[in-house]
Amino acid sequence: LNLALKALGYPEHSVDAIREMVGKGARELCLASLKGYFNGNVPEEAFEAVHRGFMREYPHTWQEGTVPYPGIREMLLSLAGEGHPLGVLSNKPHAVTVPLVRHILPEIPFREVMGFSERFPRKPEPDSLLSIVRSWGREPAQVCMVGDSAHDGNTAVNAGTRLILVGWGYSSRSALDA
């Protein structure tokens, strides 16, 4: 994001500021990154320029600093060892999500890794999660979605799955409590 902003002459955001903007997809991230510069009324041409820049850079830079949260690898291996099916559902583009997950968690036997594509609307719409649930031959109430954002929580509620929201991800505790 900062590469796209900097290339267009906008100030960069701190990692903490970006963390608060993440979770609703690239378009919303780019829009949120500009709102402070335009009193909330972001011109379409500014948004489109930043979004184009972000989409051009992200496939080449996602590896920088992308690591699993502490304890995640062990937790996932434990769940897989107990026979629980595991999947990943992200609003990141599918073409980035699959290599990202395979890069940072290569030893985890995910049954499904799904990023955003035109096939389904973005989270919090339930369609993509329900597709995963069906592919596992399960009913929504038999599946638990673990998420780190309000969007994840809303996706689980909309799909009728169980939910665990964790505080170690992108969203602050106060945002999750809301």
Where are these regions (language model features)?
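Active-site neighborhood of HAD-like aspartate-dependent phosphohydrolases
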Residues: 1-20
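Substrate-recognition/cap helix-loop segment adjacent to the acidic, metal-dependent catalytic center
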Residues: 6-8, 12, 32-41, 65, ...
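A metal-dependent, Asp-based hydrolase signature
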Residues: 20-60, 70, 78
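Short alpha-helical
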Residues: 25-28, 74, 95-96, 150-151, ...
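Conserved SAM-binding loop
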Residues: 68, 86-89, 145-146, 165
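Acidic, Mg2+-coordinating phosphoryl-transfer loop and its flanking beta/alpha structural elements
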Residues: 133, 144-178
